[in-house]
């Protein structure tokens, strides 16, 4: 399903100014939950759905309109090829990998039908701090999770060791100077989706001003 652009953007944005409480959206946000990649299965999104998901994902805060991020979509047999190469790298680090860990390394990119790499291209800028650019890439990752959910798929945001090992970057299509913000795994699941503990507001919120 492609995302259509409004014929009259000005009229569309006028509607945003008049937004009302969206109970369905609130209900979704109240239970939004990642699903472990190893619990994912087919089907995953097809190319048209992926493009729709990406169209939604780029609608994030982006100071200076720099778009300091890009995407790499991993699909099909290439995922298994990447897994075999990652296994070789892991065995170079640790020749005594257990059978269980060999399977883990080999299936890093085949647990989910689709994996989307979010690459941070943050760079020094005369006006925009690099930290803000990096946070924009993080916002893209969260938007990807939710856009995938909106299309009926489960999702998870992972990094894992190869996100920080530049020896793996050529294999993954990551250029010199770039960093991995995350690998978003997308698919279906046959497992029950269960809640996990969340922080109590009093532990993470402070207030300044206001009487109510």
Question: Model-derived features: where do they sit?
Answer:
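Short coil/turn connectors at secondary-structure junctions
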Residues: 111-114, 153, 176-180
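Small-aliphatic-rich amphipathic alpha-helix that forms the alpha element of a beta-alpha
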Residues: 57, 116, 122-170
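Short, charged/polar surface micro-motifs in flexible loops or helix N-caps
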Residues: 77-81, 88, 122-124, 166, ...
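A glycine-rich helix N-cap at a beta->alpha junction
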Residues: 172-196
């Amino acid at each position: 399903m492609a995302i259509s652009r409004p014929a009259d953007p000005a009229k569309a944005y006028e509607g945003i100014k008049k937004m009302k409480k969206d109970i369905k959206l609130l209900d979704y946000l109240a239970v939004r939950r990642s699903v472990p990649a190893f619990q994912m299965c087919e089907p995953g999104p097809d190319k048209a759905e992926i493009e729709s998901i990406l169209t939604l994902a780029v609608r994030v805060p982006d100071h200076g309109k720099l778009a300091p991020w890009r995407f790499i979509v991993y699909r099909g047999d290439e995922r298994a090829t990447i897994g075999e190469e990652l296994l070789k790298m892991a065995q170079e680090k640790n020749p005594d990998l257990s059978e269980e860990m060999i399977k883990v390394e080999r299936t890093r990119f085949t647990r989910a039908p689709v994996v989307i790499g979010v690459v941070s291209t943050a760079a020094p800028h005369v006006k925009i701090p690099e930290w803000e650019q990096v946070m924009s890439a993080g916002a893209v990752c969260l938007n990807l999770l939710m856009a995938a959910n909106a299309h009926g798929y489960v999702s998870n945001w992972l990094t894992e060791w190869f996100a920080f090992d530049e020896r793996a970057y050529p294999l993954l299509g990551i250029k010199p100077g770039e960093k991995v913000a995350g690998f978003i795994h997308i698919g279906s699941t046959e497992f029950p989706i269960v809640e996990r503990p969340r922080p109590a507001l009093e532990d993470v919120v402070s207030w300044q001003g206001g009487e109510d």
